[in-house]
Design a protein with these regions (language model features):
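Extended, alpha-helix-rich binding/interface surfaces that flank or overlap catalytic cores
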Residues: 2-59, 69-77, 84-179
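Boundary/linker elements of alpha-helical solenoid repeat scaffolds
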Residues: 60-64
Length: 179
């Protein structure tokens, strides 16, 4: 049975910082994974938001090459990110992602494979080729768009931390240890 909800905490929902909303969703997904809940059972839009944050975080950490390296350039993940960017209305980010993906597809699979196997911090012309600072100049804020998407989603429930645990415990069928 799929968990048909996106859960964010009251604290996050009331925060002025949109990253708090995104982080709340991430925390719920991480907790569900710790409880061995398969991704297929987690709300697909909650997961999409999770992976959009992964993309944005990796880009901010080390540009497009960092995302490619740390994701292993996973086709399924890339499709999810494309769908997610479109869904939250990040049209400029979507166009850049598609452009970067095309650039990568034109490269040799051997070069990509070597890049993915090497340590990221090693000097690498392939890494430099992948980077594109246009991301940082776009006037679309992915965190704000992602948070607004989560807050306005029809399946989103804003709950206290106790209510969050109770809801998840009902789904998994046992008490969840709180740290």
């Amino acid at each position: 049975m799929e968990f048909g909800k996106i859960i964010i905490s009251e604290t996050a929902a009331n925060s002025e910082n949109p990253q708090d909303v995104v982080n709340s969703n991430i925390s719920v997904i991480n907790l569900m994974r710790e409880e061995k809940i398969d991704d297929d059972l987690i709300h697909e839009d909650a997961l999409m938001s999770y992976y959009l944050d992964f993309y944005a975080s990796k880009y901010a950490e080390g540009n497009f090459s960092k995302f490619v390296h740390d994701s292993g350039w996973n086709k399924e993940l890339n499709e999810l990110i494309e769908e997610g960017l479109a869904l939250i209305g990040a049209e400029k980010h979507l166009e850049l992602f598609k452009e970067q993906s095309r650039k990568l597809r034109l490269q040799s699979n051997i070069k990509l494979g070597k890049f993915l196997k090497d340590k990221y911090d090693a000097p690498n012309a392939f890494k430099d080729l992948l980077n594109n600072n246009a991301y940082f100049e776009l006037d679309e804020n992915l965190v704000e768009l992602n948070a607004a998407f989560l807050k306005s989603h029809p399946d989103t429930e804003v709950l206290s931390v106790d209510e969050m645990f109770k809801t998840l415990e009902e789904f998994v069928g046992h008490e969840i240890k709180r740290d």
